[in-house]
């Protein structure tokens, strides 16, 4: 059976047993901040097991995509070198949430594995383990299923503590836990290894293929196990492992799925497919990289993005080792999509995006890979001992982009290890330098601790009545704020919107008789709204009733920009692809700023398309609608939730243009899209690896921007004696004339330099048989000096030359040494001395070097270094 057939058979079998087929969740866990990546089938059902979530079904089956590369579960260093380690794998699983328990779970597993209708595995090839004291499971296996006692193994607490066992699963020190039973396949006597529980169990003969976890207890802090009222079942069977069994091969890399990827990798690299470890690395890594990018991860220098970057660069290095010329890794995506795209459609729908991301990252790394490898080889050649020093590992990481595990990989191939502790010390030192160089701001919200909550009434009003329930000055609770004092006011109810979701907090004022408090910002801590500002008149005391008035004009302008970000978000997904995710935003009354995931600059044509889409929705003038509902209903309606945001039981769904944009949002918005009037993008750029930023304006600000641009066009036209109709033609003519004049100037400078060369050659002095020339030629740029040094080397024949110039307020230096002297005297060394003398830097080849500096007054002193330099070296 092919891997795809096994996957489908598993899902279909459990559907016939009353299970609901549930799609694989994203590799980015959305309900567990403790996880870097989804690494087990049960991750998406965690809240079901904990009783925090109720679903419409109590039996589920899935084929879950998983990644283990980074954090606690890190298989990266072993991938490619063993038969069963992978960065990406599929976990087949069936689950019961308080429905069936041990008897059914065991029967289901045995039936699927051994029935001639399903996998039809030989029963005599299967071994079973149970927790030592789990007599119930043991009896089901032996008395009901019929597994002989000689193929049953009881596993006790083999990890040094009560319930610390390979056959006892825990979610943590406390909480749900229970015994598990595992099914092993015997690959045969020709492979070394012993049954589970034996001294030889680490061999490859007996391989675990299916684990059934029985969650039947709740462990309390005192270590006591209490029976759960509704026991559950969590099972997992690796698709790659069971495929190897069904296809009668021992290594996962020999199954059909990997054979196709290995062939594609060999073709892309241009090498043979002979089972090399490096080829296995590439074939494995294309799966994890492809799926991670499809799920929204982009290469970066932190978090999930850095793990992805490490995997990509490891694959590139192994491809380079196999002789790859140019970019190759992205070429394997098509084979991955063909192999797994039916089961995981995101691979096909995002194939082009995955290819672009991989190619861009590969090309970026190629710029430093060869140089970094050369530096590493030089360091290894001088290595004494078998440990690569931590400072070398750090240099490769910091300068050439080599992740630590990539250097460890290379060291391993040479039977060396790396000094991880030394590397971490270097990293700590770098982090400390970064901390020392940064300026810290104080989070005023963290200083204010408020137990009460504020009732927000600002969705439909910009003013209202409230009562002062707390006052703060310098983070301390006070009874009153006097005139001129800055502080924070907390009301029992307020129309002021608190900064959230990228939208800035409202401004305005609070009035209580003759007392006025000017609100300069509004933030939130817990459920309390904090009105930051200053007392303009009188004294504000706790208990005072106030009239709260928001600056409605500012809020309205802000709301237009906020609504525009929603339209822009959807437009970005339409123009750039569904991989686009919001990474941050800032919305105020003047403009909007929107950060999003994307791997390359947005082109001018794409900018125009974005503006066209948003302005089309603006012109439709459709109502902006809100609805309060539960999170699951919102998701079913297609509402987009921002990754990493915390949502309560009820959420606010904001719809614009019908179903054009549907997002969860608690902000203040326009009433209709037409209120935005006009949308104009004013800038686009990168803010971090894999993150782009667009800034835009709307309404009156957009009109003002366009009017200013129109004035600039008029002024430019006047400067070149044209008008807006012939501006481009006129400007092109001016630029062409400028190019011609620059060319003529270069020719004149070359003639002048040649004439100067004739004059300068006679000024050379002789030092130990060589000619040494140092001269100052103000007004000449570096290009002219380089040409002159070449000319002088030909004329002088056996010489050391140093030329300097004051050019545009700075020093330009060029040094040259004829080739017959370059083994004794190096132009780069002379340049370092001369450039340092003028407060700058320089370097180059042994025969030619360039540099410069800012200290024009020291230029003559720098030129005077040429003669002593020659005297010392000759």
Curated annotation (Swiss-Prot):
Q: Where in the cell is it found?
A: Cytoplasm
How is its cofactor bound, per UniProt? Binds 1 zinc ion per subunit.
Keywords annotated in UniProt: Aminoacyl-tRNA synthetase, ATP-binding, Cytoplasm, Ligase, Metal-binding, Nucleotide-binding, Protein biosynthesis, RNA-binding, tRNA-binding, Zinc
- Please write the reaction equations for the catalytic activity of this protein: tRNA(Ala) + L-alanine + ATP = L-alanyl-tRNA(Ala) + AMP + diphosphate
Q: Which domain of life is it from?
A: Bacteria
**Transmembrane region(s):** none
User: Which SMART domains does the record cross-reference, listed alphabetically?
Assistant: tRNA_SAD
What is the E.C. number? 6.1.1.7
Q: Which cofactors does it use?
A: Zn(2+)
Mind telling me which Pfam families this protein's record contains? Answer: DHHA1, tRNA-synt_2c, tRNA_SAD
Biological process according to GO: alanyl-tRNA aminoacylation; negative regulation of DNA-templated transcription
Q: Which PANTHER family does the UniProt entry name for this protein?
A: ALANINE--TRNA LIGASE, CYTOPLASMIC, ALANYL-TRNA SYNTHETASE
The task this protein performs is described as:
Catalyzes the attachment of alanine to tRNA(Ala) in a two-step reaction: alanine is first activated by ATP to form Ala-AMP and then transferred to the acceptor end of tRNA(Ala). Also edits incorrectly charged Ser-tRNA(Ala) and Gly-tRNA(Ala) via its editing domain.
Copy the domain comment.
Answer: Consists of three domains; the N-terminal catalytic domain, the editing domain and the C-terminal C-Ala domain. The editing domain removes incorrectly charged amino acids, while the C-Ala domain, along with tRNA(Ala), serves as a bridge to cooperatively bring together the editing and aminoacylation centers thus stimulating deacylation of misacylated tRNAs.
Family per UniProt?
A: Belongs to the class-II aminoacyl-tRNA synthetase family.
Please give the name of this protein. Answer: Alanine--tRNA ligase
Origin organism of this chain? Pseudomonas putida (strain W619)
């Amino acid at each position: 059976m092919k891997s795809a057939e096994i996957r489908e058979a598993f899902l279909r079998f459990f559907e016939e047993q009353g299970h609901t087929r549930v799609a694989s969740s994203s590799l980015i866990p959305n309900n567990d901040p403790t996880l870097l990546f989804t690494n087990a089938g049960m991750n998406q059902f965690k809240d079901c097991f904990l009783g925090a979530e109720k679903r419409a079904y109590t039996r589920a089956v899935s084929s879950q995509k998983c990644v283990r590369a980074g954090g606690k579960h890190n298989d990266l260093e072993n991938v490619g070198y063993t038969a069963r380690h992978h960065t990406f794998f599929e976990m087949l699983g069936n689950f019961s949430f308080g429905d069936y328990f041990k008897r059914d779970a065991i029967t289901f597993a045995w039936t699927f594995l051994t029935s001639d209708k399903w996998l039809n595995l030989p029963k005599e090839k299967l071994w079973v383990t149970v927790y030592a004291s789990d007599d119930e499971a043991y009896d089901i296996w032996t008395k009901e299923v019929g597994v002989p006692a000689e193929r049953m193994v009881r596993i006790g607490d083999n990890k040094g503590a009560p319930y610390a066992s390979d056959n006892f699963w825990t979610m943590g020190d406390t909480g749900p836990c229970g015994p598990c039973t595992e099914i092993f396949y015997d690959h045969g006597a020709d492979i070394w290894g012993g049954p589970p529980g034996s001294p030889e169990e680490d061999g490859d003969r007996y391989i675990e293929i299916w684990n059934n976890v029985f969650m039947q207890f709740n462990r309390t802090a005192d270590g006591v196990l209490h029976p759960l009222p509704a026991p559950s079942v969590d099972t997992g069977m690796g698709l790659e492992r069971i495929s190897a069994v069904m296809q009668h091969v021992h290594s996962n890399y020999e199954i059909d799925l990997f054979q196709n990827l290995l062939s594609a990798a060999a073709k892309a690299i241009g090498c043979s497919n002979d089972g090399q470890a490096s080829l296995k690395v590439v074939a494995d890594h294309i799966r994890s990289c492809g799926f991670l990018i499809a799920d929204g991860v982009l290469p970066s220098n932190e978090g999930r993005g850095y793990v992805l970057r490490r995997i990509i660069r490891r694959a590139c290095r192994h491809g380079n080792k196999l002789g790859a010329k140019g970019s190759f890794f992205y070429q394997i995506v098509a084979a991955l999509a063909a192999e797994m795209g039916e089961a995981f459609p995101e691979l096909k729908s995002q194939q082009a995006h995955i290819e672009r991301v991989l190619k861009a990252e590969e090309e970026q790394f190629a710029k430093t890979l060869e140089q970094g490898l050369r530096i590493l080889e030089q360091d290894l050649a001088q290595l004494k001992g078998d440990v690569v020093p931590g400072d070398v590992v750090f240099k490769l990481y910091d300068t050439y982009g080599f992740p630590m595990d990539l250097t460890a990989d290379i060291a391993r191939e040479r039977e060396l290890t790396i000094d991880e502790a030394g590397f971490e010390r270097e990293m700590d030192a770098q982090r400390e330098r970064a901390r020392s160089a940064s300026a810290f701001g104080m989070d005023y919200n963290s200083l204010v601790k408020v137990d009460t909550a504020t009732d927000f009434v600002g969705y439909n009003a910009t003013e209202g009545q409230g009562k002062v329930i707390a006052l703060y000055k310098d983070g301390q609770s006070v009874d009153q704020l006097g005139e001129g004092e800055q502080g924070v006011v907390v009301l029992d109810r307020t129309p002021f919107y608190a900064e959230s979701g990228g939208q800035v907090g409202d401004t305005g004022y609070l009035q209580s008789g003759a007392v006025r408090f000017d609100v300069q910002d509004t933030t939130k801590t817990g459920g309390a709204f904090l009105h930051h500002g200053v007392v303009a008149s009188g004294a504000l005391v706790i208990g005072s009733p106030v009239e709260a008035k928001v600056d409605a004009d500012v809020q309205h302008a802000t709301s237009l920009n906020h609504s525009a970000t929603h339209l822009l978000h959807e437009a970005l997904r339409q123009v750039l692809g569904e991989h686009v995710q919001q990474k941050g935003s800032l919305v105020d009354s003047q403009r909007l700023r929107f950060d999003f995931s994307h791997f390359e600059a947005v082109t001018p044509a794409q900018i125009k398309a974005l503006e066209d889409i948003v302005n089309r929705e603006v012109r439709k003038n459709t109502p902006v609608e809100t609805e309060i509902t539960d999170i699951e209903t919102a998701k079913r309606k297609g509402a987009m939730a921002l990754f990493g945001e915390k949502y309560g039981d009820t959420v606010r769904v904001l719809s614009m243009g019908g179903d054009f944009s549907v997002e969860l949002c608690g902000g203040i918005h326009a009433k209709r899209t037409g209120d935005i009037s006009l949308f104009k993008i004013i800038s686009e750029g990168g803010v971090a690896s894999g993150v782009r930023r667009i800034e835009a304006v709307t309404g009156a600000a957009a009109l003002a921007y366009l009017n200013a641009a129109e004035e600039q066009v008029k002024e430019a036209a006047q400067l070149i004696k044209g008008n807006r109709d012939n501006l481009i033609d006129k400007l092109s003519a001016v630029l062409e004339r400028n190019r011609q004049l620059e060319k003529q100037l270069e020719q004149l400078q070359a003639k002048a330099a040649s004439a100067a060369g004739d004059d300068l050659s006679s000024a050379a002095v002789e030092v130990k048989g060589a000619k040494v020339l140092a001269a100052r030629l103000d007004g000449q740029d570096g290009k002219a000096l380089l040409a002159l040094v070449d000319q002088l080397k030909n004329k002088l024949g056996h010489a050391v030359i140093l030329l300097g110039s004051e050019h545009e307020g700075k020093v330009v230096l060029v040094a040259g040494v004829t080739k017959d002297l370059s083994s004794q005297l190096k132009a780069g060394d002379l340049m370092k001395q001369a450039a340092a003398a003028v407060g700058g830097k320089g370097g180059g080849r042994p025969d030619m070097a360039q540099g410069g500096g800012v200290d024009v007054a020291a230029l003559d002193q720098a030129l005077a270094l040429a003669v002593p330099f020659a005297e010392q070296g000759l």
